[in-house]
């Protein structure tokens, strides 16, 4: 009887702890890439969209990153970073990496807009 009680107490404590481990579940990231066109996506996981010419829109509860060569984009969610060919963006967490490993530097959105 005591063994059953102890196992029941352990189960009551362990189940809520393991239910909070989201990183153990399969991730549902969405990655979309195209040469020309537009795309739209929404969900609760990170969304990354890239296009050469066109526009895109994403919305969700997690972070959204959007970049385009010539076009426009809109995003809404908890964390949104938007940039276009003209160099506009509204985020202070942008990271830009170059091809040469010696010149890798993290830029804010304002520094990125000036450098473009």
From Swiss-Prot:
> Could you tell me where the Low complexity compositional bias lies?
32-41, 48-58
Report the leader peptide range.
Answer: 1-19
Ordered alphabetically, the record's keywords are: Glycoprotein, Proteoglycan, Signal
In terms of superkingdom, the source organism counts as: Eukaryota
Q: Where is this region: Disordered?
A: 29-102
Glycans attached where? 68, 72, 76, 84, 88
Q: What is this protein called?
A: Chondroitin proteoglycan 7
Which gene carries the instructions for this protein?
cpg-7
């Amino acid at each position: 009887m005591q063994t059953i009680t102890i196992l029941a107490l352990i189960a009551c404590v362990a189940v809520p702890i393991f239910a909070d481990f989201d990183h153990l579940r399969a991730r549902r990231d969405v990655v979309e890439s195209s040469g020309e066109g537009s795309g739209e996506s929404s969900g609760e996981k990170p969304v990354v969209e890239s296009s050469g010419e066109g526009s895109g829109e994403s919305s969700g509860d997690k972070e959204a990153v959007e970049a385009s060569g010539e076009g426009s984009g809109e995003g809404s969610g908890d964390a949104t970073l938007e940039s276009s060919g003209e160099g506009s963006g509204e985020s202070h967490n942008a990271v830009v990496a170059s091809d040469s490993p010696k010149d890798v530097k993290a830029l804010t959105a304002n520094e990125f807009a000036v450098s473009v």
